[in-house]
Design a protein with these regions (language model features):
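Generic recognition of stable, solvent-exposed alpha-helical segments in well-folded globular domains
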Residues: 20, 24, 28, 137-144, ...
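N-terminal pre-domains immediately preceding structured catalytic cores
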Residues: 49-56, 169-178, 320
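A generic secondary-structure signal for well-formed alpha-helical elements
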Residues: 33-40, 149-160, 309
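Extended, charged alpha-beta segments that form solvent-exposed binding/catalytic grooves
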Residues: 99, 104-194
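A translation/RNA-centric and nucleic-acid-associated enzymatic feature enriched
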Residues: 109, 180-335
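Class II aminoacyl-tRNA synthetase-like tRNA-binding/catalytic domains
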Residues: 1-119, 127-131
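Generic structural hydrophobic/aromatic packing signal, biased to beta-strands
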Residues: 22-25, 29-33, 67, 79, ...
């Protein structure tokens, strides 16, 4: 059973108060993010066709939930894992220009997820994407956009701390930028997750860059699909979360692959045949805009700002019976 309940933990809010606070966090952050990044909200699909190549393959092993469509002679559709590829496609189709972007409320089901305090079968996030020029595909652009996302997080923390006196601010003024290789060099004997913990304990909040490619040790820091992020220009916003004494990932984002990076990464990932899928083909033929984008966990930031011990306190999902029994014993209000 993957459940940790901190000694003496008690939620400051009951279920109804929590629901009100969740809405407050989501409404404020969504507006701040859209303003800081110049984003327009758009509607998004819950499912896509497998042959479109638009679903997010995550680490390449997770099985999507699929179903057949009666009206279309049993044609199969897949519930999205994320909208990483769909968004880039939509930016081109909807007529967005340089410096403009979109965001959407993304709901997904990850049936193969190992659930714990911060992982659920149900994923809800703001998925966003913004158009850049090819010559902006560099670390400076990445850092600039990351800082704007972090600013929206800081503004939300200020707002929630003003509304609820039990909320103590914990985000540092400055976000620290560090690469996965720098962390491996600094902590060669630790696992990737242990390195993240050491870094956030020291800095409070980091943007961990360059995730997906092999490090000097021969192992990648973590898996990333080869056909959306450029592994040399991506990363995660990770913060220290005192309630659970852990490294807490809030957002994964990056500059997206161009035609060169896509070809290289498909070969590295051992799936060069994916370049024949429609979405990947459009990148190789330079038919899609160059973009930067990411996902920001809605339940994750609600957990963080409301100081909750379990993600089930801020979203409705299905949990193992043993987890529900233990949570009830310890007074956790699972939705």
């Amino acid at each position: 059973m993957n459940l940790v309940i901190p000694e003496g933990y008690q939620s400051a809010l009951d279920i109804r108060e929590t629901e009100v606070a969740i809405k407050m966090v989501k409404d404020f952050f969504e507006k701040a993010l859209a303003a800081n990044l110049n984003l327009t909200r758009v509607s998004a699909p819950l499912f896509v066709s497998p042959e479109s190549g638009l679903n997010d393959n995550l680490n390449g092993v997770e099985r999507p939930v699929d179903f057949d469509i009666l009206e279309q002679n049993g044609r199969v559709a897949e519930i999205v894992h994320s909208l990483a590829k769909w968004k880039r496609h939509a930016l081109g189709r909807y007529g967005f220009s340089h410096g403009e972007g979109l965001y959407t409320d993304m709901n997904a089901i990850r049936r193969d997820e190992e659930t714990d305090n911060v992982h659920s079968l149900f994923v809800d996030q703001w998925d966003w994407e913004r158009i850049i020029d090819k010559d902006e595909r560099n670390t400076d652009t990445l850092k600039d956009i990351v800082s704007k996302v972090y600013q929206a997080l800081q503004e939300t923390e200020d707002y929630m701390a003003m509304k609820y006196n039990y909320i103590e601010k914990s985000l540092p003024q400055q976000l620290t930028f560090v690469t996965t290789q720098e962390l491996e060099d600094q902590y060669p004997d630790k696992t990737p997750k242990e390195r993240e913990y050491e870094a956030v304990k020291e800095h409070g909040a980091i943007f961990l860059m360059q995730i997906g490619d092999k490090l000097a040790s021969g192992e990648p820091h973590d898996g990333r699909a080869p056909d959306y992020d450029d592994w040399s220009l991506n990363g995660d916003i990770i913060v220290y979360y005192p309630v659970l004494d852990m490294a807490f990932e809030i957002s994964s984002m990056g500059i997206r692959v161009d035609e060169k990076a896509l070809k290289e990464q498909l070969v590295k990932a051992g799936c060069p045949e994916r370049e024949n899928l429609p979405f990947q083909k459009e990148i190789l033929e330079k038919k899609l805009p160059y973009t930067i984008g990411g996902g920001i966990g809605q339940s994750r930031i609600c957990m963080f700002f409301l100081k909750k011990a379990h993600i089930g306190e801020v979203q409705a999902s299905i949990w193992p019976e043993a987890v529900l029994e233990e949570a009830e014993k310890k007074g956790l209000n699972i939705l």
